[in-house]
From Swiss-Prot:
PANTHER family: ATP/GTP PHOSPHATASE, EXCINUCLEASE ATPASE SUBUNIT. Disruption phenotype: When this gene is missing the Septu type II system does not confer resistance to SpBeta in B.subtilis. The gene is ptuA. Disulfide bonds: none annotated. This is Septu protein PtuA. Component of antiviral defense system Septu type II, composed of PtuA and PtuB. Expression of Septu type II in B.subtilis (strain BEST7003) confers resistance to phages SBSphiC and SpBeta. May be an ATPase. Keywords: Antiviral defense, Hydrolase. GO terms for molecular function: ATP binding; ATP hydrolysis activity. GO terms for biological process: defense response to virus. Gene3D superfamilies: 1.10.30.50, P-loop containing nucleotide triphosphate hydrolases.
């Protein structure tokens, strides 16, 4: 991270772009790219990754749709809406920093009052570094492994909130460290103008990781004493040094000679400087159940990044990458495959590793060796969580009667798990609503029911009831209003033309309602709003669902719980709707009947998954709920043998819209073929009967004649 110097105000040509950002709408990519290059050097303001490596978008330094103060876990729903048009509050951000930052804004002490002006905002003891107001170089050091280390409280909080030591960044920084360090070495050996030019090119504002490069350069100039403090370096290193050091270096630089270089002159009191370099240790410890360590819990967003499973049940050796999704919200992963290939085993492996020792002893009745793949004596599960350097590990041994491992004793995340059988509770069952961090019993025991929705909703205070009901209402396909009558102890669901009690709804409705309520019941132990964070595992997400809801379920859950990481399984392709590239993995079996996973699947751009559904994985056709209305209107117009001019124009407009989703062909050849096929389907839909072979052949012949002209 480096200091960014930008214009105080943005050009008015970007007003529409910034308005799109405030409303979280799709932004014009061309304008966005120009905006990023002009004001932010084409890089993320925080991690310095370039737009050619990762997609950039617009960030609001102080979040404008509610703010979570990570220092105390308090959510402020009305902060900082009044700053949405303040240019000083707008920065560039990559999708991964945006996902980590979310609506976090750490403040030491009281947050500013609603509608506070700049004079009052300045008094907020903000702990997130502002690249345009602070000097980030003073807060960070680096090493050859690519890790970034903080030198201040602000530095520590910023590293945590933005997850600046995430795997991809560490790997990229390590490579840049090696290359730039080698360049400095070559310059120190030869003092060649060529290498000096190379160094200066590497620290141009649009170059990657300038903060890291400035650190390396300062090490060579100041600590290693191999490179003189040249005039060209003063604007680069000035903010990393104390004023006295800059003055001393500048004075001595005027007296420099080749003899001085050869004799390796000592430029500053390095013993004094070394004392300022902190002990390089990252404190990963935190515990979701520890009331005295909530700052550490709220300070980082934690998702599963990677998992390695070795000799667990039917899985011999499997690695899964959860970082392929580039969503700015929580990443999903849908495990797709036939029954018996190990989908459920993956969910159980995750739950077993993350639930914490207390829940493991309470829920898991099997011994560790009973989970081993038949014929093997050792196994393991390793999960890498974002924000943690070391994985959480569980070891399985044929001689062990207790689960062993590393970092697995305490719960690190809120986690819920549901098996393929999700029973509703019977009235006579005793309810248990005590605080819990892991609710995964149903994943291991199908007879453990979901929450008693009516009883639970009636038990909530008004604030909690309103939060839970909003989440449930957002899952329904039709508009619904949930209400309760605490005198008569009933919960009602008001639809457009009916008013029903919970027990009068269909089993599918009741199951979805119970699932959402179950999730909220656990999440509210740490979170007070819809931005709850955690991990939810669902086996056979399509179970009990009507096909229409099946198509919508992912989008609905993403909307209701945008910050929760869902890992689900299905063998129904309709459940893929709402997922983006990197959020689907297919489980298959090899010739030895061993399960393996593939995540290299056709792109889901515009959610065109026809290639997947007609591939060796399925061989089914696909439907897009977003486009149903377009297709309905398109086929209706095509079914008219003599459309008027207005209808012809509408057909052309619909074809243009469908072309954006590559639904009417991308070449002239494809377009004529699609026209023939669409005409066929239009007649079929109109008459509800198939065209004869002769009629269909005539359509194809017309298309052929077109190319013969």
């Amino acid at each position: 991270m480096i200091r960014i110097h930008k214009d105080k105000y943005f050009d008015s040509i970007y007003d529409e772009l910034l308005e799109q950002a405030t409303q979280e709408k799709y932004m014009d990519e061309y304008l966005l790219e120009k905006f990023m290059k002009r004001y932010f050097n084409g890089k993320c303001s925080y991690c310095e990754i370039r737009m050619k490596e990762l997609r950039l978008t617009i960030d609001f330094y102080r979040p404008i749709n509610g703010s979570l103060n990570t220092m105390d876990g308090e959510f402020h729903p009305d902060h900082y809406k009044w700053l949405k048009n303040e240019d000083d509050n707008i920065l560039s951000i990559c999708v991964e920093c945006k996902r980590a930052k979310s609506n976090r804004f750490p403040v030491d002490g009281d947050v500013a009052s609603i509608n506070a002006d700049k004079n009052k905002l300045v008094k907020e003891r903000r702990l997130l570094i502002h690249p345009c107001r602070d000097y980030p170089e003073r807060h960070f050091d680096y090493d050859e492994s690519g890790m970034v280390y903080y030198k201040s409280k602000k530095g520590e909080v910023t590293v945590d909130v933005l997850n600046l030591n995430r795997g991809m960044l560490v790997e990229m920084r390590a490579q840049v460290y090696s290359e730039f360090n080698n360049l400095c070495y070559l310059f120190s050996m030869e003092q060649s103008p060529y290498y000096l030019k190379q160094i200066l090119q590497e620290v141009q504002l649009d170059s990657i990781f300038i903060g890291l490069k400035k650190f390396i350069l300062s090490e060579w100039v100041i600590l290693n004493e191999k490179i003189p403090f040249l005039q060209e370096f003063e604007p680069l290193l000035g903010k990393r040094l104390q004023e006295e050091e800059v003055r001393v270096l500048s004075v001595r630089n005027n007296k420099i000679s080749q003899i001085d270089i050869d004799n390796n002159i000592l430029y500053v009191d390095n013993d004094k400087r070394r004392k300022r370099v902190p002990a390089r240790k990252i404190n990963d410890y935190y515990d979701v159940s520890d009331e005295n360590a909530l700052e550490k819990y709220y300070g980082k967003q934690r998702f599963i990044e990677k998992i390695e499973i070795y000799n667990f049940k039917s899985i011999r050796n499997m690695k899964i990458d959860f970082t392929l999704s580039k969503s700015s919200n929580a990443p999903w992963l849908m495990l797709l495959g036939e029954n018996g290939v190990g989908k459920s085993s993956i969910l159980q492996a995750i739950a077993l590793t993350l639930m914490g020792n207390e829940q493991r002893q309470k829920i898991i009745k099997k011994k560790p060796y009973e989970y081993l793949t038949k014929g093997f004596d050792e196994g393991s599960i390793k999960i890498k969580l974002s924000g943690m350097q070391e994985p959480i590990s569980i070891y399985l041994n044929s001689n062990s009667f207790e689960f062993t491992g590393e970092n697995h004793q305490r719960p690190r995340v809120l986690i819920l798990g549901y098996g393929s059988t999700r029973l509703l509770p019977r009235e006579e069952m005793l309810s248990n609503y005590k605080v819990t961090w892991a609710r995964i019993e149903n994943l291991f025991n199908p007879f453990i029911p979901l929450v008693n929705v009516r009883e639970y909703l009636l038990s909530l205070n008004n604030e909690d009831f309103n939060n839970v009901k909003k989440a449930i209402e957002s899952l329904f396909l039709d508009e619904v209003i949930i209400d309760r009558d605490q005198i008569y102890e009933e919960v009602y669901f008001g639809f457009a033309n009916s008013y029903s009690k919970l027990e009068d709804l269909s089993d599918g409705y009741q199951t979805i309602i119970a699932l959402a309520t179950d999730i909220m019941m656990v999440m509210k132990n740490r979170w007070r709003n819809f931005d709850a964070e955690g991990i939810v595992l669902i086996d056979e997400i399509d179970a009990h669902l009507h096909p229409r809801w099946n198509i919508e379920i992912v989008s609905r859950l993403k909307n209701a719980f945008p910050k929760i990481q869902f890992i689900a399984t299905t063998h129904n392709p309709l459940s893929l709707r709402g997922l983006i590239d990197g959020e689907v993995a297919v489980l298959l079996e090899n010739e030895e009947r061993e399960a393996y996973i593939t995540q290299k699947l056709p792109s889901q751009k515009g959610f065109n998954v026809e290639g997947l559904l007609t591939s060796k994985f399925f061989g089914l056709y696909d439907t897009m709920p977003d486009l149903n209305e377009l297709f309905d209107r398109y086929y209706l117009l095509l079914s008219n043998p003599s459309p008027n001019e207005r209808q012809k124009e509408e057909i052309k407009n619909l074809q243009d819209k469908l072309s954006k989703y590559e639904k009417v062909g991308t070449t002239l050849r494809e377009q004529k073929f699609y026209e023939a096929v669409d005409y066929y389907f239009a007649q079929y839909r109109k008459n509800n009967v198939e065209l004869s072979d002769e009629e269909f052949n005539n359509i194809i012949e017309d298309a052929i004649k077109y190319f013969e002209r």
